[in-house]
Amino acid sequence: MAEAGSVRAAAEQLVVTQAAVSASLAALQRSVGMPLVRPDGRGLRLTSAGEQYAAYVHRILGLLDEARLAAAAAADPERGELRIAAVTTAAEQIVPRLLSGFRRAHPHSGVLLEAGNRDRVRALLEHHQVDLAVAGRPEPGWDVQVHAVRAHQLVVVGSPELAARARAAAGAAAAGETGDAGMLPWLSRQPWLLREPGSGTRLSTEALLADLDITPSTLTVGSNGAIRESAAVGLGVTLVSRDAVAQELASGRLAEIAVPGTPLHRDWYLLANPDPLPLPAARLVAHVLGSSDFQLPGPPA
């Protein structure tokens, strides 16, 4: 129910009848002694108690899987499984290189890589469904250990045609033209391509627009690939990790736009729960720190 969103969807996922799901849910509520769901329109919604219960269940299931893998690794250290999650850009551009080197050193180790936005990656790590995560700066209150960091930049990009218009707008302002001339008025007239809610890049974009004091129209696009393609064909401009568009910038399919306040300097963090690392995860951390991409974390800011 917590993941599927309805009795019907849960029944379809479990390949059982809706009556069986409803009966199991009723039995669970009797067992814990409180309602875990409440009516919501034509469906059901978790109560606050249900949300808390579901969070613990996620964590327990993750720990059970972690225990199974730890036992398997102890029995056969070379055949353990590495479980890692990464925000989309890091999963596409950074983690594959790390996993390639790790697999060369440990060819019999299994690998599970989960990709998602910042909120999804945090949930996977907190619920012990993965052992490591690559994400942006941990939010205050997130009890997590930083094992390594890697610098990266967020830049504004668009099609070469839009970038040329941006330079023309900046040049007109420099020449003393008034009215709608200038970079900021031009930027405010462009559609901005945003990732989905829960994305760290979206939050950075919203903060940048607030700093620039502009309120342009926006389009929500759900993946880096779709963002790149949309920007390349001129649908709008976007703030994106330079890692995600390195090939397009090199080929000229996209162009960087010199927006005031950019590039934004950020870091990728290799994170883990504050528990002893399973052997495969510890081996990846050692491999990462031996690479040129990541460094040991500095003192807290």
Predicted segments with their positions:
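Beta-alpha-beta core module
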Residues: 142-148, 152, 226-275, 283
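Flexible hinge/capping segments at coil-to-helix
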Residues: 144-193, 197
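Alpha-helical linker/hinge and terminal dimerization helices associated
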Residues: 31-32, 53-75
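Secondary-structure junction motif
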Residues: 179-184, 188-212, 278-282, 286, ...
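A short LG(V/I)-centered, amphipathic sequence patch enriched
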Residues: 29-46
